[in-house]
Amino acid sequence: MATQEFQAETKRLLDIVINSIYSNKEIFLRELISNASDAIDKLYYKSLTDNSLDFNKDDYYIKITVDKENRQLKISDTGIGMTRQELEDNIGVIARSGSLDFKKANEQEIKDGHDIIGQFGVGFYSAFMVAEEVTIISKAYGSDHAYKWESEGIEGYSVSPTEKESVGTDVILKIKENTDDEDYDQYLDEHRLKSIVKKYSDFIRYPIKMDLTKSKPKDDNEEEYEEYIEEETVNTMVPIWERNKNELTDEDYKNFYRERHYGFDEPITHIHINAEGTISFKAVLFIPERPPFNFYTKEFEKGLELYSNGVLIMNKCPDLLPDYFSFVRGVVDSEDLSLNISREMLQQDKQLKLIAKNIKNKVKKELKNVMENDREKYEEFFESFGTLLKYGIYSEFGQNKETLQDLLLFYSSKENKMVSLDEYISRMGEDQKYIYYATGESVERIDKLPQTEFVKDKGYEVLYLTEDVDEFAIKMMGSYQDVEFKSVSSKDLGLDSEDEETSDEKEKEYKGMFDKMAEILSDKVNTVRASERLKDHPVCLANEGEISIEMEKVLQSMPNNQNVQAEKALEINVNHDVFDKLTEAYEQDEDKFKLYTDLLYNQACLIEGLPIEDPVKYTNNVCKIMS
C-alpha cells in the first residue's frame, strides 16, 4: 500500500495545523460534524431525482463514539459516502477552492497558524490539531466497494480497499497524548464532547447521537448506584428560529433566552425575523431588561451568535449590531454565508451588511412599538440603556440621530415622569418657538435653578437633562421636527418679558457698574448684565457661547482635558433687594463693592454646581458681611 504525498500547499497547511498553538482546537469537531451533515444532505438531494432511493429522515444520523482505551474518537454518518476517487479529491477544503487563498497567505509568510485556521478554516484537516493519526472508512451510495484513507500527517496518505457494510463514512481519530501545554484527554471525555456539540452544532438538522454513561439505583439496593450506557441525541436539531412564530409562545422565547445564557433577567421583548429577498436569513433577537454587570466596561463584547445553515460560525459577531444597539442579544442564521468565513472577510461581506441593516431597522421598530404600547416596560429599558442611545446620537457626528432621536426620554417640569420629544412637541403653545431644556445633576436641583423661573412662569415645559451626555446629544441634534432646542441659560430665550424695559433701562443706567463688575471678574466671566429671566433669585450665570456651563463641567472632569471654559455672563436681578445694596456699595464703598461682586459670583457658581476657586476667601467674605 503506497503512501502518496500531499500537494505542496496542503503539506504546508498540515505542518501549521499539526504544530499549531491555536487555542480553539475544539472546532475540529464542528468541522467534522458539518462534513457529516453535508454528506447526508447530498443523499437527500439525490433522492429527489432518484426514484430508487427512498429517503426516510429517521434513518439518517451522525454518531460520535469514544474508545478511551485505544484513544480513539469516531464520527460516523449515514450519508452518501465517497468513492476512491472522491477520497483522493475531496478530503479537505484547501485541496480544492482554498488553494489559491492559501498561496496568497503563504506569500505573506503567515507563520503561527492562527491566521490560517481563523481565516480559511481547515475543514477536515482540523482533525490533525488533536489527532496524531486519522483514518476514513467510506462506502459510497450505489457502490459495492469501500475504501480506507489513512494519514499520520505531512508525510502523506494512503488509500486502500476495505470492508464496510452500510453506506456512509467513519472518521476515526487517534487522539494525541497530553503535553505540558495541552490537555488532549478532554476530547475523549463524553461530557466535554457533548458540550462542544451543543456549542457549535446544536442546530444541525440531523440527530447527533452519543453513547453516554449514566447511573441508576440498583434493583436490589436503592442506596447503591450502577452505571449503564444509553444512546442519546445530544443536539436540539430544530432551532427556535426555524419554527413558525405563530406556534411559539412567550414562554418558548423566554426559555430559549435562559438556555442560551443571555442573562439572568427576562427580556422585555423579542423579535423573530424570517427575511427573504436580496438576502435571506432568520433571526431571534432579544432586548434585555437590564445590562450585564460588565456592559459599560472594556471587557464587554457586543455581538450576535452567527450561524450558517445551523452551524455556529461566530459566537459573537460584532458587525451585526451598531454600537448603540449593542445590548441586543440573540442569533442570526443565513444559508448565504460560508461556514469558514473569517472576521476579516465578514467585515467586507455585503450580505452581512444587508443583514445588519435589516436588524437595525427591526430593533428600532420594535423599540418604538414597546414605547407606544407598553410604556412602563420601555421606561425600564430606557433606564438601563438610554445612555447608550444618547451616545449613539452624539457619536459619528450625529449621523444616527434620525434613527434614535424619537426613542429618547427626558424628565419634564410638567410631568412627574419621563416624556418623549413627540409628547413635548404635542403640548407646545402656539406662540412657543423653542424646545426648552435645563441641565443639572438631578431633577430636584434643576427644578430649583433660577434660570428655569422665567420659562416656567410663561407656562412652557422644560426638559430636565440629568446625564453628562444629554446636552452633547441635544447639541448634535440641533432641532427636532424643525423646532430648535434652547437652553434656559441661553442669552436669548425668544420670550417677551414684562421687565424687559426695566432691565434695558437699568442696563443703560448702571452700565458703568456692570462694566466695573466685569473688570473685577475679568478672568471668570465675559460680561455682567441686568437679567430678564430672574424673578426671585438675585443672581445667576448664563451661557454666552456654544459650550455650556454643564458641558464645561463634563469636559473638565475628563482625563487630559484642555481646560475648556464656557463663555459665561453674570446676570443680576435688578428687582431684587440685593441690587439696591450693590448699587449703594458701588457709589459709596469700593472695597465693599468688590466684596459683594465676589460673593454674588461665587453664589452663582454654587447654584450651578461649579467649584469655588478660593473657598477660604469666600467664607471669610461671608463672615465680613455678618460681622
Swiss-Prot record:
GO molecular function terms listed in the Swiss-Prot or TrEMBL record: ATP binding; ATP hydrolysis activity; ATP-dependent protein folding chaperone; unfolded protein binding
Major place of localization?
A: cytoplasm
Spans annotated as C = 554-627
User: Which stretches does the entry tag as region B?
Assistant: 344-553
Compartment(s) where it occurs, according to its Swiss-Prot or TrEMBL record: Cytoplasm
Domain of life where this protein originates: Bacteria
Q: Where is this region: A?
A: 1-343
Q: Which regions span the lipid bilayer?
A: none
Describe its assembly: Homodimer.
Protein function: Molecular chaperone. Has ATPase activity.
Full protein name: Chaperone protein HtpG
The taxonomic lineage of its organism, from the top, reads: Bacteria, Bacillati, Bacillota, Clostridia, Natranaerobiales
Gene designation per UniProt? htpG
